[in-house]
Amino acid sequence: MLRRDFLRSSAIGFGALSLGQRELLSHFFDDPWKITMLKNDIGIFTEKGGTIGFLLSKDGIITIDSQFPEQAQHYIDEMKKKGGYPFKLLINTHHHGDHSSGNISFKGTVQRVLAHENSKKNQEKVAQLNKTEDKQLYPNEVFGKVWEEKDSGEKLTLRYFGAAHTDGDAIIHFGHSNIAHMGDLVFNRVHPFVDRSAGANVKSWMDVLDKTLKQFDKKTTYIFGHAAPGYNVTGTREDVKAFRDYLEQVYNFVDAQVKKGISQEDLVKIKTLPFDTEWKGDGLDRPFKAIYEELTMYK
């Protein structure tokens, strides 16, 4: 039996067991999360949602993104095992729930919450629409273009290069270790979600990635929010460039279809791209719809 089939069938039976039986059986399963150390006390936590990045420091732990409340609590519990350092700073790369819903788990624990000014506005707007204000921990600090702070031998810099995945995407760079957390500015071999309701712009997104490649060098390690099965949530400038080129190819394809008079309804029926690409599978309708709207909104 394949491992995934075993886990699927086991999970079904797992729910029918008593509490004591479940606690006993749970010891035979691996934790659903994974911690990977990258360099100089900087690591990543993956479970469900956007990749969490962190810096372990005696002065306090710096955390980037928070996934969902349950996953954030798993992360918090694991960090407490790594020295009991206080949680000093929580940074959100942007406002989406799979990156910021877990903020609430840090309430009363973290001293500061930081994000781009548009990210905070977007988080507040979505929470008000969904009537989930009581489930939020909003940033108590915001920045516009650049934010810098030195911490434990690291020069921590946040940069905003413009609208992309949303209109509030921050890049977080650890200068000494040369590691940049991109949030959802790079979808590694996954068709991207483009949040037009939060000011996303694919044309500008390409420019943001061009600026990113100019800002950082060939030795920079990048952390990505999401990756396709078989790919990593860390990578190099070649992965950033590959995603930038993918966006341009998709943009040009949709532009050509729009000039031919295609409707959005017919456009999203196209399931494969007419060029060689590592971006495959479901979700092509996401960039198609966004680019179509971007190209036709003033027509």
Locate each region found by the language model:
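N-terminal secretory signal peptides and thylakoid transit peptides that target proteins
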Residues: 1-14
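Conserved beta-strand hairpin/beta-sheet module of binuclear metal-dependent hydrolase folds
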Residues: 33-77, 172-174, 178-184
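Metallo-beta-lactamase
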Residues: 37, 119-162, 166-167, 175-176, ...
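Active-site neighborhood of phospho(di)ester-bond hydrolases with catalytic His/Asp-centered motifs
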Residues: 64-66, 88-96, 114-116, 181-183, ...
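Active-site HxH/HxHxD metal-binding segment of metal-dependent hydrolases
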Residues: 80-148
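Ligand/cofactor pocket segment of small-molecule handling proteins
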Residues: 151-205
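Divalent-metal (often Zn2+) His-rich catalytic cores of metallo-beta-lactamase-fold enzymes
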Residues: 206-262
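C-terminal regulatory/interaction regions
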Residues: 260-299
